[in-house]
Curated annotation (Swiss-Prot):
The keyword Transport does not apply. It comes from Geobacillus sp. (strain WCH70). Required for maturation of 30S ribosomal subunits. One of its GO terms (cellular component) is cytosol. Belongs to the RimP family. Its main location: cytoplasm. Pfam families: DUF150_C (PF17384), RimP_N (PF02576). It is found in: Cytoplasm. Transmembrane segments: none annotated. PANTHER family: RIBOSOME MATURATION FACTOR RIMP. HAMAP family: RimP (MF_01077). This is Ribosome maturation factor RimP. InterPro entries: Ribosome_maturation_RimP, RimP_C, RimP_C_sf, RimP_N, RimP_N_sf. The keyword Cytoplasm applies.
Length: 157
């Protein structure tokens, strides 16, 4: 059910975002405790502000009321993805080159399944990350199809 809902919401929100020069980052439809939440994460090259989130929320809410794909009460939340934005699509990896990332893989690569470091390259099939290995830095090449999840990482000094 949640996959079906997110697909419908994606179809509804995409034209709204295109009209506002915004992009869809992610959609979550989850139950937390007794409540259901429909979360839509949006962004643009210049970031998003609360007014844009509010406008998208209003327009999407109208569309959801028309189509009514969710049979029970839920909370609609529209927001930016935040500082640790998920990297979901190939273009997200390309835009993140030069930034710090955190990547989990489906299976170990060089004995590890988690990597944190600077994303230095992405060619569509391989994600290259420079990570610290004890006292030195080394580059790890991760096949894109082995990436289970990835996000920007905030590094505190």
């Amino acid at each position: 059910m949640s996959k079906k809902v997110t697909n419908i919401v994606e179809e509804l929100v995409t034209p709204i975002l295109a009209d506002m020069d915004l992009e869809l980052v992610d959609i979550e439809y989850v139950k937390e405790g007794k409540n259901w939440f429909l979360r839509v994460f949006i962004d643009s090259d210049n970031g998003v502000d609360i007014e844009q989130c509010g406008m998208v929320s209003e327009k999407l809410s109208e569309k959801l009321d028309e189509v009514d794909p969710i049979p029970h009460n839920y909370f609609l939340e529209v927001s930016s993805p935040g500082a640790e934005r998920p990297l979901k699509k190939p273009k997200d990896f390309t835009k993140a080159i030069g930034k710090n990332v955190y990547i989990k893989t489906y299976e170990p690569i060089e004995g590890e399944k988690e990597f944190e470091g600077e994303l230095i390259g992405f060619d569509g099939t391989t994600v290259s990350v420079t990570v610290k290995d004890k006292t030195r830095k080394k580059t790890i090449d991760i096949p894109y199809e082995k990436v289970a999840s990835a996000r920007l990482a905030v590094i505190f000094f």
